[in-house]
């Protein structure tokens, strides 16, 4: 329980610090801050991707890796499993969390939807870093239609 609170507090402070110097950054400044958060998440995802699958058998398919992310990685970071995983079986996966912990503290009003991307960049990097460590290049994006529901889209280009 304490580690969850500490992680959420640390994440909130990282976001606040990156936006503190310029509360209303232009598109370039906001893009840079999102990139920094995504980079931090990528490095954490790499470390977790190395450490967590030690007890797991080798992954046979991409889908097995994504199931690992939805179950084991999500539990390790957020103490809950991802709510759903969907795929088109062509390299696109949609992971949905109906009560994403980093968005729960935000009010559910529409005015807060524009603030949501800065609270999702770290997690996009986390997923991309874990996938990279497990041998899968990917592009991860996030979207929020209604708080605190969040969808992460993972696109794995076919080589």
Curated annotation (Swiss-Prot):
Keywords for this protein: Endoplasmic reticulum, ER-Golgi transport, Golgi apparatus, Phosphoprotein, Transport
Classification via Pfam families: TRAPP
GO terms (BP aspect): COPII vesicle coating; endoplasmic reticulum to Golgi vesicle-mediated transport; vesicle tethering
Keyword Endoplasmic reticulum applies: yes
Compartment list: Golgi apparatus, cis-Golgi network; Endoplasmic reticulum
Source organism superkingdom: Eukaryota
GO CC terms, sorted: cis-Golgi network; cytoplasm; cytosol; endoplasmic reticulum; trans-Golgi network; TRAPP complex; TRAPPIII protein complex
Residues with the Phosphoserine modification: 33
SUPFAM superfamilies xrefs: Ligand-binding domain in the NO signalling and Golgi transport
Role noted for this protein: May play a role in vesicular transport during the biogenesis of melanosomes.
Summary of subunit composition and partner proteins: Part of the multisubunit transport protein particle (TRAPP) complex. Heterodimer with TRAPPC3. The heterodimer TRAPPC3-TRAPPC6A interacts with TRAPPC2L. Interacts with TRAPPC2L.
Family as reported in the entry's similarity comment: Belongs to the TRAPP small subunits family. BET3 subfamily.
Protein name: Trafficking protein particle complex subunit 6A
Species assigned in the record: Homo sapiens (Human)
Gene name linked to the record: TRAPPC6A
